[in-house]
A protein has these predicted regions:
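Terminal, non-catalytic protein-protein interaction segments that mediate quaternary/complex assembly
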Residues: 1-241
Length: 241
């Protein structure tokens, strides 16, 4: 597993995009989309609320990520196959125990667990629901959230089974850090380290070609692998690789 340490989540976003584009391998997904992917990666940010929280190279800027965070924390009226708010704050759809529907507020559980046992390693939330997700075409990428209290600070670790690091990870990190801040506020402590683990980090290099260009800077900031560079073809380097 590669570890990327950065002073802010916006910078972590830039560094992981660079790593995947320069060192990744190209393959077609089971949905027949052209991707470049890399081995497991952990993005570690000791000061997650420090700026920049959003990379200036990302298409999705402050207004978008703030709305995304609001939807995760408070829910949305939009209709999706799943949403992270429901999975974290009301887990258990279609499940029942002795005829009683399951409704688990996992974020409440995390906060209460750490209030009662500040050294606990059990303050976790999961999103996967096999009853639903094994049948979905679009199933949750975020799988697990763990919070720990160490040295008077709330650390958060998240695990993604798969993560679109170009167009999704920036908003994912921003929203989850807002969740970390919210839980820390309930406990009356500051935020500690935020660690974002992706088991299969990837970029859809054909679908999102226009999103790659601002990060790449026509080869000035990033020198992508041959297949990506040739597919783009927007700078002189594409003709030489």
């Amino acid at each position: 597993m590669r570890v990327i340490r950065a002073p802010a989540i916006g910078r972590a976003h830039e560094l992981v995009v660079k790593m995947i584009l320069e060192k990744g391998r190209v393959l077609q997904t089971e949905d027949d989309e052209a991707t470049v992917e890399f081995e497991e990666v952990a993005l570690q940010v000791d000061t997650p609320l420090a700026g920049p929280m959003v990379s200036p190279h990302s298409r999705f800027q402050q207004r978008f990520v703030e709305q995304y965070a609001t939807d995760l924390l408070h829910g949305s009226h939009a209709s999706f196959e799943y949403d992270y708010h429901g999975r974290l704050f009301d887990w258990g759809e279609r499940l029942s125990v002795e005829g009683v529907p399951v409704h688990v507020d996992q974020i409440e559980y995390i906060a209460e667990k750490l209030k009662k046992s500040p050294v606990s390693r059990r303050a976790i939330a999961i999103t996967w629901n096999p009853v639903i997700d094994e049948q979905l075409d679009d199933c949750p990428c975020l799988q697990l959230v763990q919070c720990t209290l160490r040295d008077g600070r709330l650390a958060m670790r998240v695990i993604f089974r798969s993560n679109d690091m170009l167009t999704a990870a920036g908003a994912n990190m921003y929203a989850l850090v807002q969740l970390q801040k919210s839980i820390a506020g309930r406990l009356g402590v500051p935020c500690g380290t935020y660690t974002h683990i992706s088991l299969v980090p990837h970029i859809y290099y054909l679908r999102d070609m226009h999103d790659i260009e601002p990060f790449c800077g026509k080869g000035e900031f990033i020198q992508p692998v041959q297949e990506v560079c040739r597919a783009c073809g927007r700078c002189p380097r594409a003709k030489t690789v």
